[in-house]
């Protein structure tokens, strides 16, 4: 039986449904990071206040420019995505997003749905009493926002002893726990708010994770493993394996210095392999970004970099896992018009031309160049400006895509309606340049990486490289020599 997919409201905090974001440094508090599309669909009833734009800081030396460019991007993320540095498993990275529930004919997903329905059958017929009990219980067990009040030493489900709070957001909180039934292993438990819409989103993510974990029980394809889920005092709790920092948080804590080429190669191959697994299972992730790519372990070595005049961290083991399947969509489900976080959003999504698996490939291309540079090449919150940045980096948009789009306000006479001499136009011209000009070296491996990125950033989704093809790209040949 096909169950309905809830309408996604971009004003819900996108990071709130992502396991990845909670794996950041625990020394800072996180702010709420809202979905970048929130400012584009004001009809949603959950309103977020606007913030002012921040501009690229120019400085005298090349090193200073690179550093300030990265700082600009971080400030941009803070301003326009509600990003807050800080706790592992949480908000910017945090992508336990409030997305729609899935509709699929697959028995694995519908069986969970029916099980959940039967479990709450009685309370559904006594909604008034249920809401009264919930409100009353919050004075004892929940805070005013619906978070479960808990502290170190508390035990969930007579099994998971809380040792630390890793992060907190609109969806709930994530805690690190000791699993006393499995030899004291450490796990991450997401405790969802006792609020209907967040519970529904959690159920949607559980369904996808159950399917993926059953299909790949040993995590060969590097999707995060959900160990189990349970209810605790009205809160859905999802138990995950404990992972390291997100790749974004590692870059951020490393002063926005990029990854080494050999690490980029290994990470890129694992990401492509993981997402290709999703695609082969008729799923599109729809929210790939560095915050949703987590290191299995984020141990690092540190040495002084005389060129950058600061200490530089090098990850010891670049193995990764992909997280946050709250927005993953099956081929036969309803496809929301707007998906993906702004920086990683494909042109067919911006132009409302419809999307499928190729939108994930575009996102991966954006991720790889961010790993290479240390910052995103599309730092914007505006669709018209985003398209202008694309044209500056990748050349003119294809005429057939312009002619098909319903977003006519972005175009005039089948060309992007963009004034290069305006302040915004000058900013884009200064901030962006043709793709190959971002190359830091003309060495063969750099050429191969940019060839792969260029194929991933093909405008036309029908011509964009598939991940099955990408895994055979010459950039990955050195990996195959060692296997």
UniProtKB/Swiss-Prot annotation:
Annotated EC: 2.7.12.1
Active site: 287
A GO BP entry: regulation of RNA splicing
InterPro entries for this protein: CLK_kinases, Kinase-like_dom_sf, Prot_kinase_dom, Protein_kinase_ATP_BS, Ser/Thr_kinase_AS
CDD domains recorded: PKc_CLK1_4 (cd14213)
Keyword list, A-Z: ATP-binding, Kinase, Nucleotide-binding, Nucleus, Phosphoprotein, Serine/threonine-protein kinase, Transferase, Tyrosine-protein kinase
Activity modulation comment: Regulates splicing of its own pre-mRNA according to its kinase activity; increased expression of the catalytically active form influences splicing to generate the catalytically inactive splicing variant lacking the kinase domain. Leucettine L41 inhibits its kinase activity and affects the regulation of alternative splicing mediated by phosphorylation of SR proteins.
Motif Nuclear localization signal, residue numbers: 29-33
Enzyme superclass (EC): transferase
Bias type Basic residues, positions: 26-36, 112-137
PROSITE patterns assigned to the protein according to its UniProt record, in alphabetical order: PROTEIN_KINASE_ATP, PROTEIN_KINASE_DOM, PROTEIN_KINASE_ST
Start and end residues of each Protein kinase domain: 160-476
Location relative to the cell: Nucleus
Major localization class: nucleus
Reaction(s) catalysed by this chain's protein: L-seryl-[protein] + ATP = O-phospho-L-seryl-[protein] + ADP + H(+); L-threonyl-[protein] + ATP = O-phospho-L-threonyl-[protein] + ADP + H(+); L-tyrosyl-[protein] + ATP = O-phospho-L-tyrosyl-[protein] + ADP + H(+)
Ranges of Low complexity composition bias in the record: 84-111
Family: Belongs to the protein kinase superfamily. CMGC Ser/Thr protein kinase family. Lammer subfamily.
UniProt subunit comment: Interacts with PPIG and UBL5.
Protein name: Dual specificity protein kinase CLK1
Species of the source: Mus musculus (Mouse)
């Amino acid at each position: 039986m096909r169950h309905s997919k809830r309408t996604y409201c971009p004003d819900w905090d996108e990071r709130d449904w992502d396991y990845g974001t909670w794996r950041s440094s625990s020394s800072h508090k996180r702010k709420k990071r809202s979905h970048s599309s929130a400012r584009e669909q004001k009809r949603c009833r959950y309103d977020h206040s606007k913030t002012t734009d921040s501009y690229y800081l120019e400085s005298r030396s090349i090193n200073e420019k690179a550093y300030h460019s990265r700082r600009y991007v971080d400030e941009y993320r803070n301003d326009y995505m509600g990003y807050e540095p800080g706790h592992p498993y949480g908000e910017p990275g945090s992508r336990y997003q409030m997305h729609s529930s899935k509709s699929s004919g697959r028995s694995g997903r519908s069986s969970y749905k029916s099980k959940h329905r039967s479990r709450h059958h009685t309370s559904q017929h006594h909604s008034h009493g249920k809401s009264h009990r919930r409100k009353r219980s919050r004075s004892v067990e929940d805070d005013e926002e619906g978070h479960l009040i808990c502290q170190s030493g508390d035990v969930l489900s007579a099994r998971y002893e809380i040792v630390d709070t890793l992060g907190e957001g609109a969806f709930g909180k994530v805690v690190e726990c000791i699993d006393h039934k499995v030899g004291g292993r450490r796990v991450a438990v997401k405790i969802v708010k006792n609020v209907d819409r967040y519970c529904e989103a959690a159920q949607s993510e559980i369904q996808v994770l159950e399917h993926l974990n059953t299909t790949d029980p040993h995590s060969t394809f590097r999707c995060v493993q959900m160990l189990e889920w349970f209810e605790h005092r009205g809160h859905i709790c999802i138990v995950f394996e404990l992972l390291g920092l997100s790749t974004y948080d590692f870059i951020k804590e490393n002063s926005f210095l990029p990854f080494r080429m050999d690490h980029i190669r290994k990470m890129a191959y694992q990401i492509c392999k993981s997402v290709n697994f999703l695609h082969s299972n008729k799923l599109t992730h729809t929210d790939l970004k560095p915050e949703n790519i987590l290191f299995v372990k984020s141990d690092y070595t540190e040495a002084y970099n005389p060129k950058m005049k600061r200490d530089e961290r090098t990850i010891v083991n670049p193995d990764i896992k992909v997280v946050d399947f709250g927005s993953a969509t099956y081929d036969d489900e309803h496809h929301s018009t707007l998906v993906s976080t702004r920086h990683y959003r494909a042109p067919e999504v911006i132009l409302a031309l419809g999307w499928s698996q190729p939108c994930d490939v575009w996102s991966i291309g954006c991720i790889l160049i961010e790993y290479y540079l240390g910052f995103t090449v599309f730092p914007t919150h505006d669709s018209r400006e985003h398209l202008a940045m694309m044209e500056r980096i990748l050349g003119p948009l294809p005429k057939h895509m312009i002619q098909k789009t319903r977003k006519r306000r972005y175009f005039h006479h089948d060309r992007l309606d963009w004034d290069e001499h305006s302040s915004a136009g000058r900013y884009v011209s200064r901030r962006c340049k043709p793709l190959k000009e971002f190359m830091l070296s003309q060495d063969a491996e750099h050429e191969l990486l940019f060839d792969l990125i260029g194929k991933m950033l093909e405008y036309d989704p029908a011509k964009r490289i598939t991940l099955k093809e990408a895994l055979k790209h010459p950039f990955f040949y050195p990996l195959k020599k060692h296997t």
